[in-house]
Amino acid sequence: MRLENLESKISVIESAFAGGAAGAVTRAIAQPLDVLKIRFQLQLEPIRSGSKYSSIFQAVSSIIKEEGVTALWSGHIPAQLLSISYGLIQFSVFEKLTQICQIADPQFYLSHKHGLNFCNGAIAATVATVASFPFDTVRTRLIAEQKTNKAYNGFINAWSVMIKQEGSRSLFKGLTPTIAQIAPHAGIQFAVYKLLSENILNRIDFFQRRSSMSVTVESSLLGNLLAGSLAGFVSKTAIYPFDVVKKRLQIQGFQQHRSAFGKQIYCSGTLHCIRLTISEEGLLALYKGYGPSMLKAVLVSALHFAVYDEIKHLILKMKP
């Protein structure tokens, strides 16, 4: 039984390079949407007229007017470090786990491929999250701070000040809800993407790759973009409340530098944050920022998977 495909021809190091590069490209394009998402998630007032941020377009206009256009790329350096480190670890671990499953029991792999894609994606994302999480926390602080009342002078300063004033554990604030969020999110994402790109879209002539490097028919760049966007939509909708809670936990101890953004939330843990959010703002508050977040999720997922697969094909073409 042959399982020769694109993954089996790519080494772990090559997968890591492709994943890191895909993360860097995606982050540079999508960073403004991330800034908008975080600003909405941290706003306690209802998202309506009269609030600090009442809509996507109003928020963009307000940020540019008050803080300058570069504020839309606030925290970009730690965000890039986060995306690159996360991408290279996630994709290399996923490919390695997939190769292990294929070699260990080819028949079992084929019979349970979608479930294994979910499990491998969840494990890979968990490993990548733990390794890259400090970058995420620092990035959130830099995005969340009021630019006229800055607490930090850049990435390095933020990192050192947080450790000095709050301890090294402050770099991992919100890790628990993040793992609870990212494991099923990535599992769903990989499972849906692989299902669409390897079992559905690659069977439609319009989405087939014309010059495939594999013995199986593969989906094209357009097909991968579509598969990635749908995977991002499904997975983000399923786990979004955990993302809101994570962001709110990451700014605990930092509220004095956000006074211009309105009311602040003070919570001591994941469950406390969930209860407090629902009791004070209502159940739908767990979906604050869903609009820009969904735009970002669809864009990022589409670019991440598509760019990753294109880089893998480029690597294979360069091989003798």
Which functions belong to the PLM regions below?
Residues 79, 83-91, 189:
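Specific transmembrane alpha-helical segments of multi-pass solute transporters/efflux pumps
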Residues 1-22, 37-53, 57, 69, ...:
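Flexible extramembrane linkers and terminal tails adjacent to transmembrane helices
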Residues 26, 83-86, 128, 300:
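Residue-level signal for conserved functional micro-sites within the alpha-helical transmembrane segments
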Residues 63, 67-69:
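Periplasmic/extracellular loop-to-transmembrane helix junction in inner-membrane transport proteins
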Residues 29-32, 36:
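Short hydrophobic motif
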